[in-house]
Amino acid sequence: MQNINPTQTNAWKALEQHQKDLEQVTIQQLFEQEPTRFNDYSLKFAEQILVDYSKNNINQQTLSLLRQLAKECALNEATESMFNGEKINRTENRAVLHTALRNCANTPVYVDGKDVMPEVNAVLAKMKSFCQRVISGDWKGYTGKAITDVVNIGIGGSDLGPYMVTEALRPYKNHLTMHFVSNVDGTHIAETLKKVNPETTLFLVASKTFTTQETMTNAISARKWFLAAAQDESQIAKHFAALSTNVKEVEKFGIDTHNMFEFWDWVGGRYSLWSAIGLSIALSIGFDNFEQLLAGAHEMDKHFRTAPMEQNIPITLALIGIWNCNFLGAETEAMLPYDQYLHRFAAYFQQGNMESNGKYVDRSGQVINNYQTGPIIWGEPGTNGQHAFYQLIHQGTKIIPCDFIAPAQTHNVLSDHHNKLLSNFFAQTEALAFGKTQQEVEAEFIQAGKSLDEVKNIVPFKIFTGNKPTNSILVQKITPFTLGALIAMYEHKIFVQGVIFNIYSFDQWGVELGKQLANRILPELVGDEQINSHDSSTNGLINQFKSWR
């Protein structure tokens, strides 16, 4: 990947001037100027996903300049470098090949001259066999009973992705009950263990190194709980599986290495649900549906790699995001799925985006001080958010671009629930774009029989300025295939932005310092002696904790 400061490109400088030219033009005026705006500013994927980006503060010149920016930042070359297994994660000297995990075409993908696809396919075959045995009931626990509950123990990418997907695809779940434990707070594992029976529970310990503090602390507690009932360490093999690469530590734990599912250092944690880390997904929805999840992502990979920039959905979304955060001053993006099954979608991409692009050092090692990198990502399902934080989006002083996501078809046809849900989905983007003028507010009052003199003091509070940017993503139905495509779409959006930001999107050194300090503090919490080895605030907090515990 080349080292190109985006602010030094011709396109960036042109965009700065273009922003000034467009500053006084509202979204409403853009619609008036362009009668075919919806058709001209929307894209479809596989006739199952519609992305409408017409309600943004952009015109064709904006898009043209943004595409020029992508070209000047060598986006196409960077994309090919990723798909071809080059070590684009330079700070860790690793390839970035989550796309190989869902390479349904099975075309060779090389890392260091070796085709990785045979190993990928071998792990998938092993996962399929394991899933069939557990789901069918052939896999028995230590008392001869079939498995009824699966507990996934992981954190970060080993938890957020599998949990998000199993929740999103609950309509496809089988009889197995899934549980996810991530927090090192003992409450998380304790409350989970209250719900399950050691005779019929399977634990998946998801840790590449098998040394992750939070995961192994929870796994050891689960092991103790299990052995208190089983009274035989040899039975661990029937109730624990490992998603790891550390054979020695897995064996030491007592897990049969036949029940160890491998993945590779070219799989980043936040991109790992497509790997063995997705075993909990496959157990929950069946392996055929897991393959459909991979297939949807693979189709989006092909679209991203081959579609012209003008028709390329991930590139378009990424470029609009860069426009919003670097030229319009937005600092956050809200992800608002109008589907209760997608209630963890925003949390998943909060990690995906912020851990990838939350960087202040560019690819040359220089501090970035003249442009913004990754935005803050947040969100909740609609319509809940409407009764919580939409007030600020509509009438606050900050620009908050929003992605509204909804399925046209529901899995639960219940009275007119879905029409009411979707009426809100459509209404919100219309309200955010077009608002309500003073004249419209006054007209409403007059229609209600009020005089303008009576209401003049309340009118300003009921005005909506509009001109708030949104994308509308309408999915025909949330299926394993469309969910896979949606996830891959956002993954590639993040990649594109990282390329243009001139940062390394696939490391996460920002999580390390806190871990190091926690390891230093942990032994200090054991005794009762006063601590004075830190700053006065940290010393004071530790000592108060010791006196209160």
Swiss-Prot record:
Coiled-coil intervals, chain numbering: none
Annotated metabolic or biological route of this protein: Carbohydrate biosynthesis; gluconeogenesis; Carbohydrate degradation; glycolysis; D-glyceraldehyde 3-phosphate and glycerone phosphate from D-glucose: step 2/4
Reaction(s) catalysed (UniProt annotation): alpha-D-glucose 6-phosphate = beta-D-fructose 6-phosphate
Known EC number: 5.3.1.9
Entry GO MF terms: carbohydrate derivative binding; glucose-6-phosphate isomerase activity; monosaccharide binding
Family affiliation: Belongs to the GPI family.
HAMAP family per the UniProt record, alphabetical: G6P_isomerase
Protein name: Glucose-6-phosphate isomerase
Source organism: Histophilus somni (strain 2336) (Haemophilus somnus)
Gene name of this polypeptide: pgi
